[in-house]
Regions:
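Conserved "HGTGT" condensation-loop signature of ketosynthase/thiolase-family condensing enzymes
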Residues: 1-89, 94-135, 156-159, 169-170, ...
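Short loop-beta-helix segment that forms the pyridoxal 5′-phosphate
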Residues: 136-142
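Structured core elements
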Residues: 139, 167-168
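Short conserved active-site loop signatures built around small residues
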Residues: 147
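Active-site histidine-anchored catalytic micro-motif
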Residues: 150
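Short, high-confidence coil segments that cap the C-terminus of an alpha-helix
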Residues: 162-166
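Substrate-binding strand-loop-helix patch
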Residues: 175-179
């Protein structure tokens, strides 16, 4: 967050040429890539990182930072603490990698974590487990409207007394990289 905020105040743009793969032959060559993300450095253990797609790791990292910054941890009853974290599409990179394994190497090579890693609701579920948030847990999936929809639903849940606090947001995972 400090790096991001510092870049904002210095007028540094976060969008640049794609560096994660060769864009030759692609019309789109620009993206807002997250640089140097290390799940362990933000508190996600290695085993968890191996079982979660990058979009869910981004969600967990953001939730951990938001909860730490808010000072709310331990101050809300677990049954009144919710998680509304959506995803426009889920773990696209995992989907691409595991589909390629299936087609090129056969079904026995597909990870048993394929579905749990890629489905969009896993980010919300993992965050709820991590913070013992036993209140409402809603993974909103409404394409490009997911961010606004998620925040609106979280607001509504608090307004109508379904929860006292809700972690709300939407992670954006990396683009699906072609297999080299």
């Amino acid at each position: 967050a400090k790096t991001f905020f510092g870049s904002l105040t210095r007028g540094v743009c976060g969008v640049g040429r794609i560096t994660r793969f060769d864009t030759t032959g692609y019309k789109a060559t620009l993206a807002a890539e997250v640089k140097d993300f290390d799940p362990e450095a933000v508190g996600i253990d290695r085993a968890q990182a191996k079982r979660t797609d990058l979009f869910a790791q981004y969600a967990m990292a953001a939730a951990m930072q938001a909860v730490a910054d808010s000072g709310i941890e331990g101050r809300v009853a677990p049954e009144r603490f919710g998680v509304y974290v959506g995803s426009g599409i889920g773990g696209m990179q995992t989907f691409v990698q595991e589909t390629e394994k299936l087609l090129n190497r056969g079904p026995t090579r597909v990870s048993p974590f394929f579905i749990p890693m890629m489905i969009g609701n896993m980010a919300a579920g993992n965050i709820a487990i991590h913070f013992n948030a036993q209140g409402p847990c809603l993974p909103v999936v409404t394409a490009c409207a997911t961010s606004s929809h998620t925040i609106g639903e979280a607001f509504r849940a608090i307004k109508y007394g379904h929860a006292d606090a809700i972690i709300a947001g939407v992670p954006m995972g990396r683009m699906a990289e072609p297999d080299d």
